[in-house]
A protein has these predicted regions:
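N-terminal, Lys/Arg-enriched amphipathic/low-complexity engagement segments
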Residues: 1-38
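Conserved, mostly hydrophobic/aromatic
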Residues: 54
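Short, acidic/polar
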Residues: 61-68
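Metallocofactor- and cofactor-centric catalytic cores in central/energy metabolism, strongly enriched
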Residues: 75
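A gly/proline- and charged-residue-enriched helix-loop-helix capping module
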Residues: 91-146
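Conserved small/polar residues in nucleotide/adenosyl-binding loops
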Residues: 154-158
Length: 158
């Protein structure tokens, strides 16, 4: 994954998906789609078709990565919490690389690589795409996945 993340416009994203699926039978390099079996599990008042999915991280900030995970069978998406300091401002405050593993892992990660409105747009694009793809390609129920996001509350110091 590149150090800099570049969101893809929704129309381009959907055109890429439709073209790749028609030509190769895959989406974003995922060769074998997961087709839901009809079994579901309850979670947070919703249902999911499988009990796994990507953990929050840079990987879950771009719509195409969420879509690829869904196509492979993920149905629980822990989307990354965003905060006031974001994007370039936050990147300047955290030393690089943020993960050092010379002999034991140490992770010093910031909360968001995208700016808050960009991250929001990515989650909305992914959510809409999954609703469509689940139906069009028969991958599962449009209500068979969950986006889980923790809340970050702000208080005024004034």
């Amino acid at each position: 994954m590149s150090e800099k993340m570049y969101p893809i416009p929704f129309k381009s994203l959907m055109n890429w998906i439709v073209t790749e699926y028609a030509r190769e039978g895959e989406i974003f390099g995922v060769h074998t789609p997961y087709y839901a079996t009809g079994k579901t599990l309850p979670i947070f008042g919703e249902t999911i078709e499988t009990p796994f999915g990507p953990a929050a991280g840079p990987n879950s900030q771009l719509a195409q990565n969420i879509i690829a995970a869904y196509f492979a069978g993920a149905r629980f998406f822990e989307v990354k919490t965003v905060q006031k300091m974001d994007g370039e401002e936050l990147a300047r405050c955290v030393p690089r690389p943020c993960i050092l593993a010379a002999d034991e892992g140490y992770n010093q990660e910031w909360s968001t690589e995208l700016e808050v409105p960009q991250a929001q747009n990515e989650y909305i694009k992914a959510w809409c795409a999954l609703k469509v793809l689940s139906k069009v390609y028969g991958l599962g129920s449009p209500d068979g996945f969950v986006f889980n996001m923790s809340c970050l509350l702000y208080t005024s110091d004034a």
